[in-house]
Design a protein with these regions (language model features):
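Extreme N-terminal starter segment of soluble prokaryotic enzymes
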Residues: 3-6, 58-60
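A short, exposed loop/beta-hairpin motif centered on an aromatic-Gly-Thr core
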Residues: 12-17, 30-41
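RNase H-like nuclease fold core
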Residues: 26, 55-109, 118, 122
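A cross-kingdom feature marking charged/low-complexity
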Residues: 47-60, 160, 164
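RNase H catalytic domain
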Residues: 65-72, 112-187, 192
Length: 194
């Protein structure tokens, strides 16, 4: 007996949930950058389709990373907010050879971890992390395998921190005018010069 599948179309001719592949194909075949996925339950499909939301009253962190080829330094910038009010800015750089071969990705990872640590130190139990590098979420959720030291250590520390602070990830497009993401980017670039 064939299991029933639910096909969620996030980006296609007509986003929605479909119960047959043929119906789904009509909405994604030939559609540029179509995004769709199959699930065994309708609820899973609905949850995947639901756009990520953030708790405006909770802690929010915008994180970004940067890298300088000349110096081999990577950096991060973080802007922390609550209810639209800026609470803190974090930025730092390093050139640890274990991580510098991952370029700005190392900065993105350390920015995320430092945002979580800041939240824990200040008594928060939830944080929404806005990021532009997909690995930040995919490594944390186990969807991507960690093959390099930076991603392996990121996962190790993330696992330790997540028992003390719940994380919601929200992907933002890089360099697209998202004000706080642009500020995090500027902080990361500035940290490379200090």
């Amino acid at each position: 007996m064939t299991k029933k599948k639910y096909y969620a179309v996030k980006h296609g001719r007509q986003p929605g949930i479909y119960t047959t592949w043929n119906e789904t194909k009509e909405h994604v075949h030939g559609f540029p950058s179509a995004k769709y996925k199959s699930f065994s339950t309708r609820q899973e499909a609905e949850e995947w389709l639901e756009p990520p939301t953030s708790n405006d009253t909770g802690l929010q962190a915008y994180v970004d990373g940067s890298y300088d080829k000349k110096t081999g330094r990577y950096s991060y910038g973080v802007v922390l907010l609550q209810g639209g009010i800026e609470l803190a800015r974090l930025a730092n750089s390093d050139n640890d050879s274990r991580y510098s071969t991952s370029f700005q990705i190392a900065g993105e990872c350390f920015g995320c971890l430092n945002a979580m640590q800041w939240g824990i130190r200040h008594g928060y139990t939830e944080i929404t992390i806005f990021y532009d590098y997909l690995g930040i979420e995919k490594w944390a959720t186990g969807e991507w395998r960690a093959n390099k030291p930076v991603s392996q250590d990121y996962i190790r520390y993330y696992q330790q921190f997540k028992s003390r602070i719940a994380v919601t990830f929200v992907k933002v497009k890089a360099h697209s005018g998202v004000e706080m993401n642009e500020l995090a980017d500027q902080l990361a670039k500035k940290a490379l010069k200090q």
